[in-house]
A protein has these predicted regions:
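A structural signal for short hydrophobic/aromatic patches embedded in well-ordered alpha helices
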Residues: 68, 126, 156, 235-238, ...
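C-terminal alpha-helical cap/extension of soluble enzyme domains
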Residues: 2-3, 9-20, 43, 105, ...
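Short, flexible micro-motifs
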Residues: 15, 55-58, 88-90, 167, ...
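Glycine-rich phosphate-binding "P-loop"
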Residues: 111-114, 161-162, 276
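Catalytic alpha/beta core domains of metabolic enzymes, predominantly
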Residues: 134, 144-246, 250-253
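Active-site beta->alpha loop and helix N-cap motifs at the rims of alpha/beta catalytic domains
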Residues: 2-147, 154, 265, 280
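Short glycine-rich loop/turn motifs that provide flexible caps or phosphate-binding loops at active sites
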Residues: 11, 51-54, 84-86, 163, ...
Length: 297
């Protein structure tokens, strides 16, 4: 997919998918992935993002990463665009890029490195190496930390395959300042979902990623349709409706993020299941709170 076409897809809403496991957490539940993706494609979700933070990227082996991606591609059956998360070491990420290219997906998202010792200079070299290795793959960078600065982004804009940024760090004023400096040579996507999408769109975002889209794509579409037509009154109605759910996801210092989405999926007849450690299991009280909230949607 050429960059212009993919930018059009990125300028919409997308789902960051969960990874369902077997009951003992030892295996990827392939059948569950197929069921979940069938639900998403039947609801016309345009862009599916496996192997991200919501997909417990850092809890997957390299083989499992491939299984998740391949299963989702086959399940989507060209009914949605797939963009996978890549990362870890440079060597691992390059292998993931090669696998992605071999599976004919159009784009990848480079996750923000989780490294104990990291510097701006080192991070810049990390991105440059992967952008060069990506070749004809469209690349989205995930801003999830302070070292991916405006200056660094500007230096990386020289790469034609750098097409977008999932922005999920800092204040809205920082995001606004970034767009003022760098313009719209890439697509800016709100990486903090429906809750903050109205504010990011006012500042210049064109799309947003969503976790709740895993089980409530109609809510994501309602938000996007409102934002696309600048109906901010409607957008804020959706924002107010989903805020209690997002508050639950922020519990335990944000550690509730994925298990809350998975529990909601289970309640809706989809396959979420449990998370692998170091993510925790929810209490019965947490699960009831989720049901109480989403039953009003």
């Amino acid at each position: 997919m050429d960059p212009t076409k993919f930018k059009e897809v990125l300028s919409g809403f997308s789902v960051t998918t969960v990874t369902p496991f077997s009951d003992d957490l030892s295996q990827i539940d392939v059948d569950a992935i197929e069921l979940n993706i069938d639900f998403l494609t039947k609801n016309n979700v345009p862009l599916i993002i496996p192997n991200g933070n919501t997909g417990e990227f850092y809890s997957l082996s390299e083989k499992e990463w491939t299984v998740v991606l391949q299963t989702m591609i086959e399940a989507a059956s060209n009914k949605a665009t797939i963009m996978t998360g890549v990362g870890h070491s440079i060597k691992t990420a390059i292998t993931q890029l090669e696998i992605s290219r071999g599976l004919n997906i159009p784009a990848v998202m480079i996750l923000y490195p989780q490294h104990v010792f990291i510097s701006k200079e080192g991070l810049l070299e990390y991105y440059r190496t992967l952008l060069e290795a990506a070749k004809d793959l469209n690349v989205v960078l995930y801003k999830k930390g302070p070292l991916l600065t405006d200056m660094m982004l500007e230096k990386l804009l020289t790469y034609d395959n750098f097409v977008g940024v999932k922005y999920a760090f800092g204040r809205i004023v920082d995001f606004s300042r970034t767009i003022s400096k760098l313009g719209h040579r890439v697509v800016w996507s709100c990486g903090t979902a429906e809750r903050f999408a109205p504010f990011f769109f006012l500042a210049g975002a064109k799309g947003f990623t969503s976790g709740l889209c895993n089980f409530a794509p109609h809510v994501s579409r309602r938000m996007f349709d409102a934002l696309k037509t600048s109906n901010f009154e409607e957008a804020m109605k959706v924002q107010e409706m989903i805020t209690p759910f997002e508050d639950l996801r922020e519990g335990r210092g944000g550690a509730n993020n994925v298990p809350v989405v998975k529990a909601a999926m289970d309640h809706m007849g989809l396959k979420g299941g449990s998370c692998r450690p170091p993510i925790h299991q929810l209490t019965d009280e947490d699960r009831q709170a989720i049901i109480d909230i989403i039953s009003k949607w």
